[in-house]
Amino acid sequence: MDTPTLRILETITSNIGNPLSINQLTQRIKDTHGSAYYANIYQKLQELKNEDLLNLELIGRSANIKLNFQNYLLIDMLAEMEIEKKRNFLTNRKELFSFFSEMDRSITDNCAVKSVGSINPSKNIKLNRIELFFLLRASPNYHKETIELCRQMLKLQNKYNLKINNLIISNQDFLELTTSEEINPIREALSEKIILFGPQSFWNEIKEIAQKNEIRTIRPEIKPAKISDSDLTYNLNRFGYREFGLRFAQGKNFCIEYVTTAILLQEDARLIEAIPIILAKSSFKSNVLAFLSQKYDVSRKLLGLLRILNNVKPTREVTQTIDLLEILNTEEIPADSESIVQKLRLYNAL
């Protein structure tokens, strides 16, 4: 794949759900790679359009660029793009070859794994960590398979002294999260990822979703510690916790897992006791919550809260999150059980 095509496809696929004009595409490529020229981009886009890989939809005097998923060969082209991205990432990082080789071996025989991607790998590897997201096939043993993958990745983490954070998602959860109006980690991952394993399977999944739904990517990366107080208050109310006498205004919709993580990053004991309430009153995704708590180093606090909640109001999500944190050898920080139970009763969460 030639470099202009790679850069164009990489930029378009990082903005699925947010169609770019040719000017915007040129600017994004320039911001990322240092240079880009409208005339060259336009010429290459026309070539890709003639190959039926892209559609250019005229809107006024500009054209929005979209992937043409009706073309059977597009998936192969996108898989080739992912392989090129992987090659470029690893070219000067030979020390990672043995890690990825062993990771491939550990998942090759796992029929549940559809594809594996790395989130923002260039940034994370500089911090001696890697964030992996696993897309799993539909299975009645989803939680069991998640636990086994966590065990395998923990072994690799210990062997290679490389921090690994796992975001393990079923195909149904993937559908829900990619099309959600809430800000969540999967929508972020789509804009800054390399598919390391099973790129064709990944893009076929995206194709199936995109043909029926609007996929919504997010840029840049969300930092939960910087979620505003007003947005926290608004979202706490959405999930069933409202402080008496406190007014709130419409804010951004964050997923409950991000709201929980943002609160855990604060030192406000009053707000932290809101976490069991919203988790008791609202559904959440155990794998996403475990991933975020590990990524932002708040899993010990979270486990202490979940143990109390599990004692008084056990649910599948709570139990499964505890399972995941325990597999990752998390040591809980105990919370005030009496105070939390009182709050749960006050908010009719029991």
Pin down the residues of each PLM region.
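Short hydrophobic/aromatic beta-strand micro-patches
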Residues: F133-R137
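Glycine-rich beta-strand-to-loop/alpha-helix junction loops that act as flexible
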Residues: K114-S118
